[in-house]
Amino acid sequence: MTLRTTALATDSWPAFTTHSADDVIVAALSISRLVDWCGTPCVHTADAATPGSGGRLSETELASVLAARVVSARWSGDLRLHVVIDAELDGCRPVVEEARHVGRASTAAAAAVVLESGRTRAAGYAAFLPGDIAAGDLVVIPCLVVIPCLGVTLLHDVKP
C-alpha cells in the first residue's frame, strides 16, 4: 500500500506511530533512518498501543516493527508479485496487511504480493504493496510480539 493513500491501523503499530509519504515514524524515530544506522533486517521495539484505544500507549505491553530489505521481486504465474525479504517472519505474529513500503514514495497501484523470507523456505504471507516494489526497497511490518531474533539488530525504547 502506498503511504499517501492509506492510514495506519493504530492498534497494529506501536503507540505514537505516524507516517509520511516515504517513511514510518515510531515514537519520533524514523524507521528509514534506523535502517541507515543498523542495516537490515532490524527491529524497533516500543510500547504497544492499547487495543481499541486509537493508538494510546499501553502501560504493560510492547510491540515490534521489523524493517527488511527486498532481495527480489518477481511476478509469478499465480498473478501475484512474489517479494523475497532478508528477514524471517515466522514467530513474530506479523500484521502483514499493514506492511508498508518505505524509503521512497510510490504512486504505483497496490498489488497482491506474497512476502517470502530469503532465510527459510517457509510459506509466504499475503499482503498488498506497491506494484513497482523492487530489489533494494525497504518493507516495514508491525509485529504483535517482541521479536527475540538472533542475528537481527534490535533497538528498544526504554521508559524513563
Predicted regions and their residues:
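Conserved alpha/beta-domain cores
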Residues: 2-64
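Charged (often Lys/Glu-rich) extended helix/loop segments that serve as interaction or gating elements
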Residues: 30, 55-160
